[in-house]
Structure formats: C-alpha cells, structure tokens
Amino acid sequence: VAKLIGDIAPQLPRHGSTQMSVHTLQGALELKELGFARVVLARELSLPEVEHITKNCGIETECFVHGALCMCVSGQCYMSAFLGGRSGNRGSCAGPCRLPFEANALPEGKPGRLHHLSLKDNSVIDKLDKLQAIGVASAKIEGRLRTPEYVAAAVSACLAGREGRAYDRDLLKNAFSRSGFTSGYLDGKIDGTMFGVRSEADAELTKKTLPALRELYRRERSRVPVEMKIEIEEGGEKLTVTDGTNKAFAYGDAEPQPARTDPTESLSRSLSKTGGTPFAAEKIDVEMDGGPWFVPGSAVNELRREALDALLKKRETLRPWPVNEVELPPLPLRTLPPHRTLRARFERWEQVPEQALSGVEYLILPIGQADRVPREWREKTLLELPRVMFGALEEDTARRIAATQDAGFAGYEVSNIAHLRL
C-alpha cells in the first residue's frame, strides 16, 4: 500500500502511525526505505531508545507526550477486537482494559475482581525539552474520546512545556487522570506505580474544574500571522499581504497628499486592525517614494479589507497533490489446496507430540527454540520471530537469524515491519 501511494502521489508525505508498532531502529529504517517522512514511535520506548532511533533513522520522529496508555504494546493488541469487534490496531479501541477483571489465582483473602489491567495516563510534558534536544520533530497528544476541556488543558500545558514555562499540573490532572499520571516508560521505570483507575474523586475534581478549563479556550481564536507592506507614491498606493505561502495585492487610487509629520505609525495602526478576520498582522512595512505622504484612514482601511479578502480566497482554494496515472497490477488468483493443511504453533519443543510430523504442514516455534529442533524435523519447522524487540532484543534476534539461516529450517514467521531488515 505504501509503495502504491508513493507511485500515485509521490509528493504526498507519508507518516507511519503507532498502529505500525515501530519500536526499533530497523523498523524506522524500513519505513524510510518505503518513502515515509515520519514515524510515530511506540509509547513503550525509553528516552535512550527514542534518542537512538531518532538520531539514526534519517526521517522525522513523533512521540506521545500525554494521554492514555495501552496495557499491551502499541499496535499489537487484539483484546478490544476479540471482545467487541473494535480493533485498537485500526484506531477503534473500546478500552476494555479499563474494566474490572477476575483473577482467581490471587492469594486467599485478596479481592479477585479488580482493575488489574488499567494503566495511568502517560504524561511527559516536563520532558519536552529533552525530546527536543535529541531531535524529536513532533509531540503527540492522545485525545481520542476526550472532552474539549481535556484537549484545552493538554494543549495549553504542552505549549508551556515547549516554551520552557511552568504549567498547572493540578489543572491538567483534574481535566482527566486515573489517580495521577505516569512517565514510567520514558523514564525506564516500569513497575506497579504505573497502574491506576478513574476514581469517583477524580471525576468529582473534573466536574469542579470544568469552568476553569473552559476559560482556556472560550476566547480562543486561531489567527494566521501575515506580513504587510504598503507602498505609497504620488500616483497611488499598493498593499501586499502574505501568509508565507500565498500573496495578495490591493491597489488604491486616493491621491496622497504631502504629510506634515511622519505617518508611519498611523498607517501601521490602521493596517493592524484585522479584527473580524482570521488574520493577525505580524509585521508591517511602510515604504514611501518622495514622501512623506498622507493617505486618509478610510482609504487605508479599504486597502486592508480588499487585500485580506483576496488572501482569504487564495487560502480557500484547494491545491490537490499531483497524482500520477498508475496501472495497478492484477491481483493473483488464489486457489484452494486440494486438501486442508494444518500449521501448529508450540511455545517449546517439548510440547510437540511425536506424531506431529505426519499431521501438519509446518511446525511453528519461537526462534529461541531452534537449537532444540532435531535436524530431520527442521525442513517442516518455521521459526517465529519475536513480535516485540525492545532494547537489545533486536540485535539478539538478528544474531539468531544469522545463526539459523543455513541450518535447514523451512523459513521464518514475521510479525513486525522491522523483521524485513533482519
């Protein structure tokens, strides 16, 4: 799919989402080779792991800095899909790990039905400076199914953190938390303190804080910064407005009159009155040929309105990405085998029954079991590569692949994009 998108729209930037479960350097390098411009790294990485990938992958990296954590591993969870048909790997997780579950194996006297799988929300906003320092290009907030108040609190805190300003951590916590936050993954401190549930006290604090949270965005209005340049000469006026990408012009026919004093300040004041528009004047230049010249305020206001209206129309014009006509290759026809086949997976070689060779097409065993497989069984054995390879496990897996390539095995079972490069 990635190659097809690249062939059809080569200028369209492609970002690899967290559902791709990229948590190793080799996974990020594979995305680069496929033409991706950015990879969203798994939430479970530590800061040194993020740094290693960011500094060596050759594409932009994006990291989660606030929001919900998955009890499983990013892009590897099927719990919601199996229990309710909503796949977390397709961005539709229903969050079943937040529910209480029975654990019959708990010691006697301890309650069994508890929130054994519920993690606190991740929050590493106070480490934004460290992420910036190692080259992370973008900070990501997990805000799916959250309220506007939550989004306002998280965004405000991130903006403050990015600029090195203090932010109200209590206000952020009251917007939504599960008995506090955790930074365990990024800090490399993975322990029981990462677990938390949404208590009645948490919900009550959120309710009390809602008015303050709403103030964060009640008067908010996004403004597009623009630069203006007005040029005045004896025959008339010209105003140029640009947002950095688009440029618009307006021409006036009011005959300027010689000015007794420098009109630069009054002209800038009139041009900066962009209220009622989505624009804000960030820079204003005034150029006068043979002046100083006086131009009536009404004429300047008309120039401003005309130029900003023209700029707005240009911004509203859709600019589609260039698209190539590509002939799609025909899909290969799939034919059913003449008889059913069975591929059986076992965790350890000791679990394989003696009669398995005659009853299965392939045995599947973890690659760590390779040395235990007798040579006469290897041509029917697929070696399973680990789904997750945090830390040194990626290098260890690469060594195991090199050691087993010529050992007579039927092949490997892959489950992560990084496996393609090992």
Which role does the model predict for each range below?
Residues 1, 7-13, 29-422:
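Surface-exposed amphipathic alpha-helical tracts and adjacent flexible/coil segments at the periphery
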Residues 11-12, 16, 20-25:
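Gly/Gly-Pro- and Ser/Thr-rich, intrinsically disordered tail segments characteristic of DNA damage-repair
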